[in-house]
A protein has these predicted regions:
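Acidic (Asp/Glu-rich) sequence patches and key acidic residues
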Residues: 1-97, 107-109
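Short, hydrophobic/proline-enriched secondary-structure or compact coil segments at domain edges
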Residues: 101-105
Length: 109
């Protein structure tokens, strides 16, 4: 599969980096899924609109930050191109609009 694995945590990057393992990330994971090669378009559109910031562009991972208000509407209505989507509404409900999210995109090529 050529594409990306995207995960969204309800923590700023400096806090997300402290988490090790699935048990540690589970309470903060909002959603994760697999997409094809154009699957970062929505993130880059947020960056272009000034609603997200790209922190790293390495692919291992590429990292973005954005406020929940700008990302949650997107993930609450899953798109057909989001493969293997794991959606965690119980964690999403805990986010305020101002929560800073860490969005990691791992290159699957």
């Amino acid at each position: 599969m050529i594409g990306w694995w995207i995960s969204i945590l309800s923590l700023p990057p400096e806090e997300a980096d402290k988490l090790i393992g699935r048990e540690a990330t589970a309470p903060h994971m909002l959603a994760n899924w697999e997409v094809g090669t154009s699957g970062l378009r929505w993130l880059n559109d947020l960056v272009d609109a000034g609603k997200a910031q790209k922190l790293k562009n390495e692919g291992y991972p590429s990292r973005y930050v954005a406020k929940a208000a700008d990302v949650l509407p997107f993930i609450e209505t899953p798109k057909e191109w989001m493969r293997q989507l794991v959606h965690r509404p119980e964690n999403i409900e805990k986010c305020s609009a101002e929560t800073v999210l860490t969005i990691d995109a791992w290159d699957l090529s």
